[in-house]
Amino acid sequence: MATLQRSKQAPNVEEVAEVEAAFDRREKLIDGKVVSKTITDELKAKVEDMRADHDCVPGLAVVLVGERPDSAQYVRMKKEKVAEIGFHSVDLNLPDTISQEELIAEVKKLNADPMIHGILVQLPLPEGIDTNEVLKAIAVEKDADGFHALNVGNMWLSGGDPPLAVACTPAGCIELLQRYDITVSGKNCVVLGRSNIVGMPICALLQSMNGTVTCCHSRTKDTAEKVRVTGGG
Protein backbone atom coordinates (compact mmCIF):
# COMPACT_ATOMS: atom_id res chain seq x y z
CA MET A 1 0.00 0.00 0.00
CA ALA A 2 2.89 2.36 0.80
CA THR A 3 4.18 1.84 -2.71
CA LEU A 4 0.80 2.75 -4.18
CA GLN A 5 0.69 5.92 -2.11
CA ARG A 6 4.13 6.98 -3.32
CA SER A 7 3.13 6.42 -6.92
CA LYS A 8 0.29 8.90 -6.51
CA GLN A 9 2.59 11.67 -5.36
CA ALA A 10 3.52 14.44 -7.78
CA PRO A 11 6.78 13.53 -9.54
CA ASN A 12 9.95 15.35 -8.55
CA VAL A 13 10.54 18.19 -11.01
CA GLU A 14 14.30 17.64 -11.11
CA GLU A 15 13.87 13.91 -11.75
CA VAL A 16 11.44 14.59 -14.60
CA ALA A 17 13.86 17.09 -16.13
CA GLU A 18 16.68 14.56 -15.92
CA VAL A 19 14.59 11.86 -17.60
CA GLU A 20 13.49 14.24 -20.35
CA ALA A 21 17.09 15.30 -20.96
CA ALA A 22 18.16 11.66 -21.20
CA PHE A 23 15.33 11.02 -23.66
CA ASP A 24 16.46 13.95 -25.80
CA ARG A 25 19.99 12.52 -25.85
CA ARG A 26 18.86 9.11 -27.07
CA GLU A 27 20.35 7.73 -30.24
CA LYS A 28 18.49 8.69 -33.38
CA LEU A 29 17.91 6.08 -36.04
CA ILE A 30 18.85 7.74 -39.31
CA ASP A 31 17.00 6.10 -42.18
CA GLY A 32 19.00 6.84 -45.30
CA LYS A 33 16.50 5.10 -47.59
CA VAL A 34 13.71 7.45 -46.53
CA VAL A 35 15.90 10.51 -47.07
CA SER A 36 17.08 9.15 -50.43
CA LYS A 37 13.48 8.74 -51.60
CA THR A 38 12.65 12.29 -50.50
CA ILE A 39 15.66 13.76 -52.31
CA THR A 40 14.93 11.72 -55.43
CA ASP A 41 11.37 13.06 -55.53
CA GLU A 42 12.65 16.62 -55.03
CA LEU A 43 15.14 16.26 -57.87
CA LYS A 44 12.53 14.77 -60.20
CA ALA A 45 10.36 17.83 -59.65
CA LYS A 46 13.29 20.20 -60.30
CA VAL A 47 14.22 18.38 -63.51
CA GLU A 48 10.63 18.59 -64.73
CA ASP A 49 10.63 22.32 -63.98
CA MET A 50 13.86 22.73 -65.97
CA ARG A 51 12.39 20.80 -68.86
CA ALA A 52 9.24 22.93 -68.84
CA ASP A 53 10.95 26.29 -68.33
CA HIS A 54 14.17 25.88 -70.33
CA ASP A 55 13.62 22.84 -72.57
CA CYS A 56 16.72 21.12 -71.18
CA VAL A 57 17.74 18.75 -68.41
CA PRO A 58 21.03 18.23 -66.55
CA GLY A 59 23.55 16.09 -68.41
CA LEU A 60 25.97 13.74 -66.65
CA ALA A 61 28.89 11.92 -68.26
CA VAL A 62 30.36 8.89 -66.48
CA VAL A 63 33.81 7.73 -67.55
CA LEU A 64 34.70 4.12 -66.76
CA VAL A 65 38.19 2.84 -67.52
CA GLY A 66 38.70 -0.92 -67.48
CA GLU A 67 36.40 -3.69 -66.31
CA ARG A 68 36.62 -3.76 -62.51
CA PRO A 69 33.41 -5.47 -61.30
CA ASP A 70 32.99 -3.13 -58.33
CA SER A 71 33.40 -0.02 -60.47
CA ALA A 72 31.03 -1.40 -63.11
CA GLN A 73 28.38 -2.10 -60.47
CA TYR A 74 28.74 1.38 -58.99
CA VAL A 75 28.36 2.93 -62.44
CA ARG A 76 25.23 0.85 -63.08
CA MET A 77 23.71 2.15 -59.84
CA LYS A 78 24.45 5.72 -60.89
CA LYS A 79 22.91 5.13 -64.32
CA GLU A 80 19.73 3.77 -62.76
CA LYS A 81 19.38 6.77 -60.46
CA VAL A 82 20.11 9.21 -63.28
CA ALA A 83 17.43 7.58 -65.44
CA GLU A 84 14.94 7.63 -62.56
CA ILE A 85 15.46 11.35 -61.96
CA GLY A 86 15.34 12.23 -65.65
CA PHE A 87 18.88 13.39 -66.39
CA HIS A 88 20.50 13.14 -69.80
CA SER A 89 23.42 10.74 -69.43
CA VAL A 90 26.44 9.67 -71.43
CA ASP A 91 28.52 6.58 -70.64
CA LEU A 92 32.10 6.46 -71.82
CA ASN A 93 33.58 2.97 -71.39
CA LEU A 94 37.29 2.89 -72.15
CA PRO A 95 39.80 0.01 -72.14
CA ASP A 96 42.34 -0.25 -69.34
CA THR A 97 45.06 -0.04 -71.99
CA ILE A 98 44.25 3.61 -72.66
CA SER A 99 47.10 6.04 -72.04
CA GLN A 100 46.89 8.95 -69.64
CA GLU A 101 47.10 11.42 -72.51
CA GLU A 102 44.28 9.70 -74.39
CA LEU A 103 42.08 9.65 -71.28
CA ILE A 104 42.66 13.35 -70.64
CA ALA A 105 41.79 14.07 -74.28
CA GLU A 106 38.45 12.27 -73.80
CA VAL A 107 37.76 14.29 -70.66
CA LYS A 108 38.46 17.53 -72.52
CA LYS A 109 35.96 16.53 -75.21
CA LEU A 110 33.33 16.23 -72.49
CA ASN A 111 34.39 19.62 -71.12
CA ALA A 112 33.53 21.13 -74.50
CA ASP A 113 30.17 19.34 -74.84
CA PRO A 114 27.36 21.84 -74.04
CA MET A 115 24.95 18.98 -73.29
CA ILE A 116 27.14 17.75 -70.45
CA HIS A 117 26.97 19.66 -67.17
CA GLY A 118 28.75 17.18 -64.93
CA ILE A 119 31.64 14.77 -65.48
CA LEU A 120 32.40 11.83 -63.22
CA VAL A 121 35.54 9.73 -63.68
CA GLN A 122 35.06 6.45 -61.84
CA LEU A 123 37.94 5.65 -59.49
CA PRO A 124 40.28 3.89 -59.08
CA LEU A 125 42.03 4.26 -62.41
CA PRO A 126 44.43 1.62 -63.76
CA GLU A 127 48.07 1.65 -62.73
CA GLY A 128 50.21 3.97 -64.79
CA ILE A 129 47.60 6.73 -64.92
CA ASP A 130 48.05 9.73 -62.62
CA THR A 131 44.63 10.16 -61.04
CA ASN A 132 45.32 13.74 -59.95
CA GLU A 133 46.24 14.80 -63.48
CA VAL A 134 43.05 13.30 -64.87
CA LEU A 135 40.89 14.94 -62.21
CA LYS A 136 42.56 18.30 -62.81
CA ALA A 137 41.67 17.99 -66.50
CA ILE A 138 37.94 18.11 -65.66
CA ALA A 139 36.54 21.63 -65.97
CA VAL A 140 35.97 22.78 -62.40
CA GLU A 141 32.37 23.79 -63.17
CA LYS A 142 31.70 20.23 -64.42
CA ASP A 143 33.41 18.42 -61.55
CA ALA A 144 30.49 16.28 -60.37
CA ASP A 145 32.50 14.42 -57.71
CA GLY A 146 34.12 17.47 -56.13
CA PHE A 147 37.63 16.05 -56.63
CA HIS A 148 39.09 18.96 -58.61
CA ALA A 149 41.92 20.65 -56.70
CA LEU A 150 40.08 24.01 -56.72
CA ASN A 151 36.93 22.49 -55.22
CA VAL A 152 38.96 20.62 -52.60
CA GLY A 153 40.89 23.76 -51.70
CA ASN A 154 37.76 25.90 -51.40
CA MET A 155 36.21 23.27 -49.14
CA TRP A 156 39.04 23.77 -46.63
CA LEU A 157 39.12 27.58 -46.81
CA SER A 158 37.40 29.48 -44.03
CA GLY A 159 35.32 32.37 -45.31
CA GLY A 160 36.28 31.85 -48.95
CA ASP A 161 34.24 30.80 -51.95
CA PRO A 162 32.34 27.56 -51.33
CA PRO A 163 33.23 24.56 -53.51
CA LEU A 164 31.06 24.07 -56.58
CA ALA A 165 30.73 20.39 -55.66
CA VAL A 166 31.54 18.14 -52.71
CA ALA A 167 32.38 14.43 -52.80
CA CYS A 168 29.14 12.46 -52.72
CA THR A 169 29.61 10.33 -49.58
CA PRO A 170 30.66 13.24 -47.33
CA ALA A 171 27.91 15.41 -48.82
CA GLY A 172 25.42 12.62 -48.14
CA CYS A 173 26.52 12.31 -44.51
CA ILE A 174 26.06 16.04 -43.93
CA GLU A 175 22.71 15.98 -45.73
CA LEU A 176 21.50 13.24 -43.38
CA LEU A 177 22.55 15.25 -40.33
CA GLN A 178 20.75 18.32 -41.62
CA ARG A 179 17.59 16.44 -42.61
CA TYR A 180 17.39 15.04 -39.08
CA ASP A 181 18.11 18.43 -37.46
CA ILE A 182 21.26 17.11 -35.79
CA THR A 183 23.40 20.03 -34.64
CA VAL A 184 27.15 19.73 -35.19
CA SER A 185 28.26 23.06 -33.71
CA GLY A 186 30.06 22.62 -30.40
CA LYS A 187 30.04 18.82 -30.56
CA ASN A 188 32.95 16.38 -30.56
CA CYS A 189 33.02 14.54 -33.88
CA VAL A 190 35.13 11.47 -34.64
CA VAL A 191 35.84 10.51 -38.26
CA LEU A 192 37.26 7.06 -38.97
CA GLY A 193 39.56 7.19 -41.99
CA ARG A 194 41.46 9.93 -43.81
CA SER A 195 40.95 9.14 -47.49
CA ASN A 196 40.72 11.98 -49.98
CA ILE A 197 37.32 10.69 -51.09
CA VAL A 198 35.55 10.30 -47.73
CA GLY A 199 37.45 10.89 -44.50
CA MET A 200 39.22 14.18 -45.17
CA PRO A 201 36.24 15.90 -46.85
CA ILE A 202 33.98 14.91 -43.94
CA CYS A 203 36.51 16.42 -41.52
CA ALA A 204 36.51 19.67 -43.49
CA LEU A 205 32.72 19.84 -43.65
CA LEU A 206 32.24 19.11 -39.95
CA GLN A 207 34.82 21.75 -39.05
CA SER A 208 33.03 24.27 -41.26
CA MET A 209 29.92 23.53 -39.17
CA ASN A 210 31.88 24.36 -35.99
CA GLY A 211 32.31 20.79 -34.85
CA THR A 212 35.45 19.76 -32.94
CA VAL A 213 36.82 17.04 -35.18
CA THR A 214 39.14 14.13 -34.40
CA CYS A 215 40.32 12.11 -37.39
CA CYS A 216 41.30 8.51 -36.57
CA HIS A 217 43.33 6.41 -38.98
CA SER A 218 45.60 3.37 -39.10
CA ARG A 219 48.22 5.03 -36.88
CA THR A 220 45.77 6.38 -34.30
CA LYS A 221 46.08 5.00 -30.78
CA ASP A 222 43.01 4.26 -28.62
CA THR A 223 40.53 4.74 -31.47
CA ALA A 224 37.80 2.90 -29.57
CA GLU A 225 38.18 5.23 -26.60
CA LYS A 226 37.94 8.30 -28.82
CA VAL A 227 34.71 6.95 -30.28
CA ARG A 228 33.31 6.19 -26.82
CA VAL A 229 33.98 9.76 -25.69
CA THR A 230 31.57 11.00 -28.35
CA GLY A 231 28.89 8.57 -27.21
CA GLY A 232 29.20 6.47 -30.33
CA GLY A 233 30.12 3.21 -28.67
Model-found features: residue ranges?
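Short beta-strand segments enriched in small/hydrophobic residues
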Residues: 57-66
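Non-catalytic terminal and connector segments of soluble metabolic enzymes
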Residues: 2-5, 84-86, 109-112, 138-141, ...
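Anion-binding alpha/beta catalytic cores of soluble intermediary-metabolism enzymes, centered on
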Residues: 30, 118-188
